[in-house]
Design a protein with these regions (language model features):
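Catalytic cores and adjacent binding grooves of peptidoglycan-active enzymes
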Residues: 10-18, 48-113
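A generic short-segment signal for beta-strand/edge and adjacent turn/coil regions
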Residues: 8-9, 26-35, 69-75
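Extended, low-complexity, intrinsically disordered C-terminal regulatory tails
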Residues: 18-52
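N-terminal, Lys/Arg- and Ser/Thr-rich interaction peptides
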Residues: 1-10
Length: 113
C-alpha cells in the first residue's frame, strides 16, 4: 500500500511559493516511500511567529507526528527527498509534547529558487 498526503480540516494554502511546492513534493515522496499517510496540520493558516513567518509565505508546513509508527523515520524520509539541504530543512519540533510535529521549511535567510 502506498501512503499519500492528507490535510487536516481547516488547513489553508492561501499561497504556495516555489519552495513550498518543493516541500510538498518531499512530503509526498516520503509518504509514498513509507507506505503510510502523512497529514499536513498547518499551512498558511494558524498563529505562528509573526507576519513574516514562512508559513504565511507558503514556505513552511507542519506534519502530524503523534500517529506515526516512528516520527524519526518519517523525518529522515522527508529530508531524503528534499532537493537541497542547503536551502531547506525539516526537524521534529516540540518533541515529547502535545504540540510535537515535523516542521519543514525553506531555511531562514535563503531564497528558493
Amino acid at each position: 500500500m502506498s501512503g499519500v498526503v492528507r490535510v487536516k480540516p481547516g488547513v489553508e494554502f492561501a499561497v504556495i511559493a516555489p519552495g513550498g511546492f518543493e516541500l510538498l513534493a518531499a512530503i509526498t515522496l516520503a509518504a509514498s516511500s513509507l507506505g503510510y499517510d502523512l497529514t499536513i496540520t498547518s499551512g498558511t493558516d494558524g498563529v505562528h511567529s509573526g507576519p513574516n513567518d514562512p508559513h504565511h509565505r507558503g514556505e513552511a508546513y507542519d506534519v502530524r507526528s503523534h500517529d506515526l509508527p516512528d516520527p524519526a523515520v518519517a523525518l529522515q524520509q522527508i529530508q531524503l527527498h528534499l532537493i537541497d539541504l542547503e536551502r531547506f530543512f525539516a526537524f521534529i519540533e516540540d518533541p515529547g509534547t502535545d504540540n510535537e510535529h515535523i516542521h519543514c521549511q525553506v531555511k531562514k535567510g535563503t531564497t528558493y529558487p
